[in-house]
């Protein structure tokens, strides 16, 4: 790996220039001066009169301190000092001629004085910002107050200051005077040149938040372990390899970020009450950790992205309270179902840019899951879809699951558990989300006693409580039954016995009747009705006594026959144990054969009903959310999910068939009252699935230009035979074992000298194209990487800047190199002509 560094880690980073509009056509020639200096004959810096397409030269930023400032945007670039309109070259008078505008040019000393004046601390302020000020030490002006210091006579205790933010400076140490800020709660010294934390910092008993990212720590600063009051600690982008044992003593710590360090494993000394843990961009290989098990009671957010994890250990099943799990850019091939199924609190699951080709069926049991990121994996069925398509419209989560049989089994189990709860509650109001992931709806009605056998869907005389789930679920009941019973739901337990005879094939529009224990029955319609359903209607009062007598006689007959058979079997068992065993085997084989035959018959019926249902569904769309006579009632089903809405429509079913569907933004329960019968339909909660991958643009043969995410998409890069990656930014290689990298550490600012790297980058690009292919990228794929691409085309094709620019923008229309880079490309054009 080749690594180039232009600025030291703690050097000042100038302000970010404004990003302009996309070029379309010839680049304006007046932007470039003949000598490449970026100035015109009028002595003013080059800029266009269109504010949306300027690249202004950064100026030193300023900031103010006031009591109403917050630390929510402390790392952002502050507003630069301006003097008039910097982008205006001249103004037109009434005659239409252009006059040069006068612009006062501040000297360096004047700028510094103005900055220092603007940074004067206002006595009594609770926050002080001093970002990008090139401070070499903490300014002493903040030590003002009513109580003078005995140790430092010229300074005073400042009891008002709560937040001190001095990011992106050149501070090398924390002074002892920091003790004069006894009520300081937030201290941020990110992007400085610190290498140690002094012990006296622990004297700040109110300090809760400490941010020391992007400094020069080669090991974890031990004195941090003595600051017991810390609740937030950030040490991103240092060279920390491990954590000390005493770190576990920070019992108040809830938010810890060790992003972009050199950790080889998940530390064992994590404090007990961590809620948010960021270990991304390290070198972690093993996902097993004792500390994760220990803190699982409090952990809600875990980031393990950009590591080298290949296997998710079974111990990760302890993450029962995690709501956000980030596993981007690892080497994961399989997600164990036993692990995934235990993440019941999960709301956001990020798995982009791994090697996953299948999701476990257990993912459908995660009721709180709302966002699933699957970009850049190996799901074959969606590779040919354009990335512009909406994933939430095209695909459902079930399509990413290969084990459909297990999927149906899990859905059935979940629905039966819900049905059992509804029976136990003996409620007439549906408040539970029924999983409706499969195709055909089934209606189950509770709170009734018996069921008549009919050839059509019965209409009850009283309002019933119908709950929709899918007909495919019933297949699993048949597959797992014996000759006499099958498992569903009862009032006392989770089992309901379905008698074998209900599954015998019926002809001539006869239905299969199933009698449930206690007061609930299920009827499976097997004729060619318009909609396959399982329904439990209320029986007529006139038939009640006769049906009860018939049931009693039938039960007595079964009981007598069973007793006789049991007595005979007991005698045979006592006489010949061997015969008993053989008989059991034969009996089980016969039962298995019958069940297999019944399973095939029912599967064939289900298949035909699904086809018919889909045809009917296309002709008559579902109930609209916003049509006539709606009455909405909010019912909470899950604590972390949006509440479903119940919409009651008292209207004829013929009218419902003609209504157009509307897009539903939340889970929905639709109750339709028609002829004194209530039908309830519950739609599954919406899930946002990201599957589209961002891919780079092909500029010329075997040369791709893109953003940083394109460099993350290793599956696409491997599929397109990319072997080399040129990174024109300060990003460490993501996959050094898969690709060869050249890192050019340079900022996207006008003053940066990218010209000096043209020769080295061109050689690397040539090598990559010879080996298979090369990707050139920066953060956005707009300025730095575009400049490198243009320079290579100028050299390789022996063309001028404008022609190389046109070739590049044709392949990637969003490119926009900054003004300084454009001037250097113009200079490169002159050098090539020599």
Swiss-Prot record:
Active site: 778 (phosphocysteine intermediate)
Record protein name field: MAP kinase phosphatase with leucine-rich repeats protein 1
Compositional bias annotation for Low complexity: 36-78
InterPro entries: Dual-sp_phosphatase_cat-dom, Leu-rich_rpt, Leu-rich_rpt_typical-subtyp, LRR_dom_sf, Prot-tyrosine_phosphatase-like, Tyr_Pase_AS, Tyr_Pase_dom, TYR_PHOSPHATASE_DUAL_dom
UniProt keyword list: Chemotaxis, Coiled coil, Hydrolase, Leucine-rich repeat, Protein phosphatase, Repeat
Polar residues compositional bias, start-end: 79-98, 511-536
Keyword Hydrolase: yes
EC top class, as a word: hydrolase
Disruption phenotype: Cells result in higher prestimulus and persistent stimulation erkB phosphorylation upon cAMP stimulation, display strong defects in motility, and more rapid cAMP production. Cells fail to display aggregates, fruiting bodies, fail to form territorial streams and are defective in cell migration (absence of random and directional migration) and in chemotaxis.
Organism: Dictyostelium discoideum
Ranges of Basic and acidic residues composition bias in the record: 538-554, 569-582
Enzyme nomenclature, EC number: 3.1.3.16, 3.1.3.48
UniProt function note: Probable phosphatase with dual specificity toward Ser/Thr and Tyr-containing proteins. Dephosphorylates pNPP, in vitro. Essential for proper regulation of erkB (erk2) and optimal motility during development.
GO molecular function per UniProt: phosphoprotein phosphatase activity; protein serine/threonine phosphatase activity; protein tyrosine phosphatase activity; protein tyrosine/serine/threonine phosphatase activity
Coiled coil stretches, renumbered: 555-615
Reaction(s) the record says it catalyses: O-phospho-L-tyrosyl-[protein] + H2O = L-tyrosyl-[protein] + phosphate; O-phospho-L-seryl-[protein] + H2O = L-seryl-[protein] + phosphate; O-phospho-L-threonyl-[protein] + H2O = L-threonyl-[protein] + phosphate
Chain positions covered by the region annotation Disordered: 1-103, 503-584
GO cellular component: cytoplasm
LRR repeats (start-end): 160-181, 183-204, 206-226, 229-251, 252-273, 274-292, 298-319, 321-342, 345-366, 368-389
Family: Belongs to the protein-tyrosine phosphatase family. Non-receptor class dual specificity subfamily.
């Amino acid at each position: 790996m080749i690594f180039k560094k232009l600025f030291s880690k703690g050097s000042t980073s100038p302000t970010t220039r404004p990003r302009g509009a996309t070029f379309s056509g010839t680049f304006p020639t007046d932007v470039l001066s003949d000598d490449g200096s970026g100035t015109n004959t009028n002595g003013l810096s080059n800029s266009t009169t269109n504010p949306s397409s300027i690249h202004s030269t950064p100026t030193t930023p300023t900031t103010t301190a006031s009591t109403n400032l917050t630390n929510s945007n402390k790392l952002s670039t502050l507003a630069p000092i301006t003097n008039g309109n910097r982008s205006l070259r001249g103004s037109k008078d009434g005659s239409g001629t252009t006059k040069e505008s006068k612009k006062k040019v501040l000297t360096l000393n004047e700028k510094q004085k103005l900055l220092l004046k603007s940074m004067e601390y206002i006595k009594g302020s609770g926050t002080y910002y001093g970002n990008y000020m090139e401070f070499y030490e903490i300014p002493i002006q903040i030590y003002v107050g009513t109580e003078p210091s005995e140790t430092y006579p010229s300074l005073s205790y400042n009891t008002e200051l709560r937040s001190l933010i001095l990011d992106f400076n050149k501070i090398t140490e924390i002074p002892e005077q920091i003790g004069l800020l006894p009520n300081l709660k937030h201290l941020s010294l990110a992007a400085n040149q610190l290498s140690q934390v002094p012990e006296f910092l622990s004297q700040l008993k109110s300090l809760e938040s400490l941010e020391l990212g992007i400094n020069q720590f080669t090991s974890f600063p031990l004195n941090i372990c003595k600051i017991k009051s810390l609740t937030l600690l950030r040490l991103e982008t240092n060279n920390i390899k491990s954590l000390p044992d005493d770190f576990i003593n920070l019992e108040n710590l809830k938010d810890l970020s060790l992003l972009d360090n050199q950790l080889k494993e998940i530390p064992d000394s994590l404090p007990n009450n961590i809620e948010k843990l960021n270990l991304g961009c390290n070198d972690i290989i093993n996902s097993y950790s004792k500390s994760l098990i220990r803190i699982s009671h409090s952990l809600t957010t875990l980031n393990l992205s950009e590591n080298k994890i290949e296997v998710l250990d079974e111990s990760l099943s302890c993450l029962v309270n995690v709501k956000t799990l980030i596993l981007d850019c690892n080497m994961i091939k399989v997600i164990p179902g036993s692990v995934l199924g235990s993440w019941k609190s999960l709301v956001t699951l990020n798995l982009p840019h791994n090697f996953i080709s299948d999701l476990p069926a257990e993912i459908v049991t995660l009721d709180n899951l709302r966002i699933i990121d699957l970009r850049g994996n190996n799901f074959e069925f969606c590779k040919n879809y354009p990335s512009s398509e909406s994933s939430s419209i095209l695909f459902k989560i079930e399509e990413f699951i290969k084990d459909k049989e297990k999927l149906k089994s899990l859905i059935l189990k979940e629905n039966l558990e819900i049905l059992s709860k509804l029976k136990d509650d003996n409620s007439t109001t549906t408040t539970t989300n029924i999983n409706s992931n499969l195709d055909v709806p089934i209606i189950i009605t509770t709170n009734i006693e018996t069921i008549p056998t009919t050839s059509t869907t019965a209409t009850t005389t009283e309002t019933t409580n119908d709950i929709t789930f899918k007909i495919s679920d019933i297949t699993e009941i048949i597959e797992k039954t014996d000759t006499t019973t099958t498992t569903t739901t009862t009032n006392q337990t989770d089992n309901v016995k379905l008698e074998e005879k209900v599954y015998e094939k019926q002809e001539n529009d006869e239905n299969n009747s199933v009698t449930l224990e206690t007061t609930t029955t299920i009827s499976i319609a097997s004729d060619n009705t318009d909609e396959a359903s399982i329904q439990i209607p209320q029986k007529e009062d006139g038939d009640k006594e006769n049906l009860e007598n018939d049931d009693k006689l039938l039960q007595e007959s079964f009981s007598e026959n069973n007793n006789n058979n049991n007595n005979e079997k007991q005698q045979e068992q006592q006489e010949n144990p061997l015969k008993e065993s053989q008989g059991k085997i034969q009996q089980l084989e016969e039962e298995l054969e019958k069940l297999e035959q019944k399973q095939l018959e029912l599967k064939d019926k289900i298949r035909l009903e699904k086809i018919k249902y889909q045809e009917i569904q296309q002709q008559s769309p579902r109930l609209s959310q916003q049509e006539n006579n709606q009455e909405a009632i909010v019912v909470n089903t899950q604590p972390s999910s949006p509440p479903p809405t119940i919409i009651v429509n008292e209207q004829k079913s013929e009218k419902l068939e003609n209504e157009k569907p509307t897009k539903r933004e939340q889970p929905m329960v639709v109750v339709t009252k028609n002829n004194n019968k209530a039908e309830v339909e519950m739609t599954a909660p919406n899930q946002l699935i990201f599957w589209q991958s961002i891919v780079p643009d092909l500029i010329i043969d075997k040369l791709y230009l893109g953003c940083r995410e394109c460099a993350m998409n290793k599956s696409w890069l491997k599929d397109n035979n990319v072997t080399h990656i040129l990174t024109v930014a300060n990003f460490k290689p993501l996959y050094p074992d898969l690709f060869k990298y050249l890192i050019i550490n340079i900022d996207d600012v006008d003053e940066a000298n990218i010209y000096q790297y043209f020769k080295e980058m061109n050689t690397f690009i040539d090598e990559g194209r010879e080996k298979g292919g090369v990707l050139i990228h920066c953060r956005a794929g707009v300025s730095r990487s575009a400049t490198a691409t243009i320079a290579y085309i100028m050299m390789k094709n022996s063309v001028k800047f404008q022609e190389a620019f046109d070739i590049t923008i044709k392949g990637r229309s969003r490119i926009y190199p900054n003004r300084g880079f454009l001037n250097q490309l113009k200079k490169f054009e002159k050098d090539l002509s020599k």
